Amino acid sequence: MKLLEQARKFREAFGQEVLECVSRYGFINSRLYQMQTALVAEEATEFLKAADELYADPENDKCKENFLKEASDLVFVVYQHCAAHGFDLDTAMDRVFESNMSKLGEDGKPIYRKDGKVLKGPG
């Protein structure tokens, strides 16, 4: 089951609103937008804390488990935010993957910035 389908099932099971679109004027339900955005911010903070704890103690199994749990929670609430407003994040993620895989130089090798970030290729 794709993550978007899981997000929609969760919203349905728990009586959470699902809008079919965002209007041309922006988010059409400010209460829903603010709630979902607050959840993403909360989970992002928890994820970053777990990442710092794992960085400080990379061999600690509890830190590893907590990092994975917080990463999953963050992804879940981002999917919830998108599902609530009718966005298909699975399709968007497929497009990002395809775009990222095209980031090769003319020689077929990745191009890196000094800090290690992969840069877009000529195509």
Spell out what each predicted region is.
Residues 1-71, 75-123:
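Flexible "arm" and connector segments at domain edges
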